[in-house]
């Protein structure tokens, strides 16, 4: 079975074709980073218009890359949410239309389930059960995963997501968009413990997160210190260390609570090298395992949507011809497969 995946939830247009026997056959991606850079963040209307321009040409490119034609596609999977409503509608409309024209199923995919399953694309995929840490610009969640669609929310951010806090703090430091990767690069030049930031909500029980106060702390630290390059790097280092420590402490608690020995990290922030290193060290001490996707599959991409669509089709998922998206869509509402 071959599934075409379409990802248009935010500022990346991702198209991929996944074969259940041969694996990934094609992967096309167009990033809108340059389009939004002058605005310091994603402009929804511009994102939607660019998806309209890029989606069909990328589908054609994916078919060419794989050496396939429309007749070889058995299902079309598209991101139906969560995300920007206009951007989602572009992918949903094109996905439904192609599925109708090709007489194949159209499968709506949950964007965060796509991220959660992205490590399954690697040579050493995780086995169930595991704790999933989903960290991106819009989400910071800890999930107990016992099977496809068997998701229990253990904790989440009550305000800013980790990725959002990275981007906002990067902006305070005068860094270009996208800020998260730029802040991490700057932090690598910083001196450890020159500044010490709080570890939010780690002094109390529970698995929820809060990062808005950390952003405010960073703003005050920036305002009260010199604006030289080394000071900015030291502040970036302190901020990154605080976020990574907080995520690690909560992961420990989630693993203790569930008794699981496997940790899956997914979402854009999971590409952060410091976070990967610290979680690897933690899981080695616990004699457990940590799994994550290669960096290009941590950020938004069509491969994870094609794979998630494949899993759902095999689980018996069906859909009618209506075009519907859900900008807000709790992961726990997904059915088991």
Curated annotation (Swiss-Prot):
Transmembrane segments: none annotated. Its main location: cytoplasm. One of its GO terms (cellular component) is cytoplasm. Substrate binds at residues 134-138, 167, 180, 272. The keyword Ribosomal protein does not apply. Its cofactor is Fe(2+). The keyword Metal-binding applies. One of its GO terms (molecular function) is N(6)-L-threonylcarbamoyladenine synthase activity. Binds 1 Fe(2+) ion per subunit. InterPro entries: ATPase_NBD, Gcp-like_dom, KAE1/TsaD, Peptidase_M22_CS, TsaD. Fe cation binds at residues 111, 115, 300. PANTHER family: TRNA N6-ADENOSINE THREONYLCARBAMOYLTRANSFERASE, TRNA N6-ADENOSINE THREONYLCARBAMOYLTRANSFERASE, MITOCHONDRIAL. This is tRNA N6-adenosine threonylcarbamoyltransferase. It comes from Enterobacter sp. (strain 638). The gene is tsaD.
